[in-house]
C-alpha cells in the first residue's frame, strides 16, 4: 500500500483540512479515517473540500473524547484494523496525536506502525509548537516510521519553523493558513503549492 498518514501534535490542529488538501494534490488517493470520535464527521468534510474518494468504513464513536474512553463509553474495545493490501494510494488521518490511547495496551502510533506509511505531521505555528512537534517526530522515528515532513498551520512564524527544521532534522513541507472562508476553491489553490513527491 502507498500513501501518507496524517497525524497532528494535538487534537484540533488542522489534520482534516490538511488531509483534504493532500487529496486535492494527489487525486488518485482514497481518504480513510479509521477511528472517529465525537459528532464532527471529518470524512464528510474531506469529501466536501476535495471531491475525492472517501472510504466510510471505520470505527465511529459518538462521544468527543479520547478513543479509548469513547470506546469504553460505547461498551466496546477498539482493535487496530489491518492495513490495506490492494495497492491503492491512501491518505489516512489519525485521531488526536501519536500517543492518544486506543485501548488498554495500544496507542495511535501502534496503528500507524501497522500501516507503515510515511507520516505528515500537522503542527501549530504558535508558542509551544517546537516542543510538541519535536516530541511527535521523536516518537514516530522511535517506532521506525518515516516522517515525510511537517505542515505548520496558522499565522506564519519563521523562528518556530527554523527551530523545528534544525532541532528535528525534518523538513517543513508546507505552511497552511487558517482559511476564512474555507472553500474548496481556496483550498485547491493552496494545495497546488504542496510537494508532488511525498508519495513514492
Predicted segments with their positions:
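N-terminal phosphate/diphosphate-binding loop that engages ATP/GTP or pyrophosphate donors
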Residues: 3, 12, 17-82, 86-88
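Short internal beta-strands
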Residues: 31-35, 120-123, 148-154
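Short, structured coil segments at secondary-structure junctions
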Residues: 50, 115, 167-170
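Switch II (G3) loop of P-loop NTPases
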Residues: 83-103
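C-terminal lobe/tail of nucleotide-utilizing enzymes
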Residues: 137-200
Amino acid at each position: 500500500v502507498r500513501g501518507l498518514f496524517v497525524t497532528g501534535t494535538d487534537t484540533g490542529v488542522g489534520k482534516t483540512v490538511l488531509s483534504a488538501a493532500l487529496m486535492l494534490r494527489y487525486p488518485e488517493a482514497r481518504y480513510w479515517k479509521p477511528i472517529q470520535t465525537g459528532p464532527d464527521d471529518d470524512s464528510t468534510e474531506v469529501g466536501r473540500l476535495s471531491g475525492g474518494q472517501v472510504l466510510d468504513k471505520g470505527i465511529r464513536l459518538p462521544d468527543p473524547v479520547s478513543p479509548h474512553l469513547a470506546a469504553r463509553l460505547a461498551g466496546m474495545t477498539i482493535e487496530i484494523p489491518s492495513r490495506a493490501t490492494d495497492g491503492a494510494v491512501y491518505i489516512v488521518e489519525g485521531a488526536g496525536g501519536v500517543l492518544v490511547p486506543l485501548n488498554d495496551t495500544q496507542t495511535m502510533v501502534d496503528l500507524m506502525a501497522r500501516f507503515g506509511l510515511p507520516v505528515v505531521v500537522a503542527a501549530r505555528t504558535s508558542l509551544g509548537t517546537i516542543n510538541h512537534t519535536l516530541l511527535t517526530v521523536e516518537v514516530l522515528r522511535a517506532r521506525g516510521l518515516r516522517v515525510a515532513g511537517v505542515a505548520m498551520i496558522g499565522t506564519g512564524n519563521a523562528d518556530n519553523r527554523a527551530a523545528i527544521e534544525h532541532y528535528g532534522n525534518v523538513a517543513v513541507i508546507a505552511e497552511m493558513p487558517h482559511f476564512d472562508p474555507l472553500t474548496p476553491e481556496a483550498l485547491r489553490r493552496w494545495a497546488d503549492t504542496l510537494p508532488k513527491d511525498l508519495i513514492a
